[in-house]
Amino acid sequence: MVRYKATISYDGTLFSGFQRQRHLRTVQEEIEKTLYKLNNGTKIIIHGAGRTDAGVHAYGQVIHFDLPQEQEVEKLRFALDTQTPEDIDVVNIEKVADDFHCRYQKHLKTYEFLVDNGRPKNPMMRHYTTHYPYTLNIKLMQEAINGLVGTHDFTGFTAAGTSVQNKVRTITKATVSRDEKTDFLVFTFSGNGFLYKQVRNMVGTLLKIGNGQMPVEQVKVILSSKNRQLAGPTISGNGLYLKEICYEN
């Protein structure tokens, strides 16, 4: 067997997330169906570095899979790209070592979250931004977001029901700015891993702080208390993008 690593992008609007689910349309299912056709009915399982939720988009999701025989990478990329649905793009494919694993190999993930703060909202971007029509103080959010940088137990920012025991993660970058062209707010988070709905919960909390409903110190209170009830709401996922995954070496 020969192992391949692929970088893919997708519009998450019509997907029920990345991971295969029974009777639902997912990114994993669509790619595996295409690989099945390309490999003469041989079942191919793909593994994803991140399990994006329903409606969440990706510019730089990474997957890996094993094929029975070695193939020329550009021909493989072209075939997979042209035969998957139009809301999936296969950006790059490369051959990797047999022990490479896209999820467990040490890496840095970057997520981006777009918020349409306009009144009225931009209807053309309703699937690609999350609308928040209330007054926001960006300076308060910029001050608060700095408290997320570093190594912390993010229990207070994860969704209930997660099976992950160790909730300590390291965030190396956390910023919020306003895009001058679109006027959207852009939240950016880079780190060694993120818990279930962590980014959406962090953005929901920062918006409450920007709106004056929570103090700037609330981020530190949530981290120290590990109490999900003290954080903001889980904001809808249509503004969330898996931007990039960078592997060591």
From Swiss-Prot:
It is an enzyme of class 5 (isomerase). The active site is at D53. The keyword RNA-binding does not apply. Its EC number is 5.4.99.12. It comes from the Bacteria. Transmembrane segments: none annotated. GO terms for biological process: tRNA pseudouridine synthesis. InterPro entries: PsdUridine_synth_cat_dom_sf (IPR020103), PsdUridine_synth_TruA (IPR001406), PsdUridine_synth_TruA_a/b_dom (IPR020097), PsdUridine_synth_TruA_C (IPR020095), TruA/RsuA/RluB/E/F_N (IPR020094). It catalyses: uridine(38/39/40) in tRNA = pseudouridine(38/39/40) in tRNA. Keywords: Isomerase, tRNA processing. Substrate binds at Y111. The keyword Isomerase applies. GO terms for molecular function: RNA binding; tRNA pseudouridine(38-40) synthase activity. Pfam families: PseudoU_synth_1. Gene3D superfamilies: Pseudouridine synthase I, catalytic domain, C-terminal subdomain, Pseudouridine synthase I, catalytic domain, N-terminal subdomain. Belongs to the tRNA pseudouridine synthase TruA family. Formation of pseudouridine at positions 38, 39 and 40 in the anticodon stem and loop of transfer RNAs. Homodimer. This is tRNA pseudouridine synthase A. It comes from Streptococcus pyogenes serotype M1. The gene is truA.
